[in-house]
Amino acid sequence: TRKEGVSRTYKGYDGYAPIMAYIGTEGYLVNAQLREGKQHCQCDTPAFLRETIAMCRQITDEPLLIRLDSGNDSAENIGILLESDCYFIIKRNLRRESKDDWFEMAKAKSQNVTAPREGKTVYTGSDWKPVSYTTAD
């Protein structure tokens, strides 16, 4: 295809790499960018986060909960969210970490362990690490 911005995605298809931000339980669109398909999801995300948080602050004074995918698990994003007084959930990117080591840490740090059905155990807790970061802009 010759559409502007279309390129090979990481899944091997021609397409785009959109990024979108919604607010509220109703899911109102606050911000969106249609980015080139070959672009990594973290590329330009710090600026998008800042812009989106500023837009949300114009809409509400309520606390913000930001959810990000594992591709956005970066110290820079965490720093922006901490400085902006946002709550956040970021899917962990294990990178080169051992899944077994991560599971042992999760079990050790859990304050609540439930078994909603046979064969499924849910560990709920938190573990905070010091994060140092610099922003690109």
Where are these regions (language model features)?
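Active-site beta-loop-alpha junctions enriched in small/polar residues
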Residues: R35-G37, D69-D73, N93-R95
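Active-site beta-loop-alpha junctions of metal-dependent nucleic acid enzymes
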Residues: L34-M55
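A conserved hydrophobic secondary-structure block that centers on an alpha-helix together
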Residues: M55, T60-R67
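An anionic, glycine-rich sequence signature occurring as long contiguous blocks
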Residues: Y87-D137
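Gly-rich Lys/Arg/Thr-decorated short loops/hinges at beta-loop-alpha junctions or inter-strand turns
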Residues: T25-E36
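Short, conserved catalytic/metal-binding motifs centered on acidic residues
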Residues: T1, G27, L64-D73, F88
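Active-site-proximal, Lys/Arg-enriched surface segment
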Residues: T1-A21
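Short, surface-exposed basic-aromatic patches at helix termini and helix-loop junctions that form
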Residues: I78-Y87
